């Protein structure tokens, strides 16, 4: 069963592409990144040039794909989208690059998952707008250079640290996307409700935003699920009590925690005395992949002060003990982390 509060894209999310803003003026939040992009886009348009290459990084579900599409719309060009795992061979990338028009945007999601061989092809394409193609094999092999139209590469990643330095250094614009505030998410929920013709009261929107883990993708997904409850049990209007009742039935608490979040936290607290405990040990204890815990679950728990990362492992904070109704051990036993 798919988690309702997963920040990753689900089939349900793909249906509601109408919720994506098409212009920077309609994009809510990320003011710093948005302000910088507006300046760079305006300058590129005035010069009649392609926008410099852009790297967007941050936790999943914060709008990296949406921003890539907005960049193309604001520049008045086409966008071609792909992802790192899909580009398996240099020939795959060459086929994409040679079909670009001048100033087009090439969006590569999960760019940190590009293979080293494919990256080598990308370097001259980004820097010199040239494609090096090797013809033949062995001593008779030769390299020919193909000129490419000047294009903009927009890369998106949740793990910027895994990008190689040569690739990262070729991006002229690097922006980190942050978790959204409750006020920003309330605005997003209200806008989405209007587009979907959902009746929602201000307090209902605020309560829904508060449980959305700082992530617009989750907010929009919860909005659709709560809408179902409202239509069946509350005359179709989303109020704060309707949000509370429906999310309780979906096992999402007032902090936005679901069953997996509680499993991780209670494993650290109950099985390992609050930590420190290694990530591999946690993964084995709950039957989940290490990378999934680190990339999907941990950012939210750390952001809200429920887990501390230490050289010796993960440690549950006093806030975590209080939230789950457990008695915290003396500070000294947790390395004075409280």
Swiss-Prot record:
It is found in: Cytoplasm. The gene is ruvB. Its main location: cytoplasm. This is Holliday junction branch migration complex subunit RuvB. It holds the Pfam family RuvB_N. It comes from Geobacter metallireducens (strain ATCC 53774 / DSM 7210 / GS-15). Residues 254-338 are annotated as: Head domain (RuvB-H). ATP binds at residues 19-20, 61, 64-66, 127-129, 170, 180, 217. Keywords: ATP-binding, Cytoplasm, DNA damage, DNA recombination, DNA repair, DNA-binding, Hydrolase, Nucleotide-binding. It is an enzyme of class 3 (hydrolase).
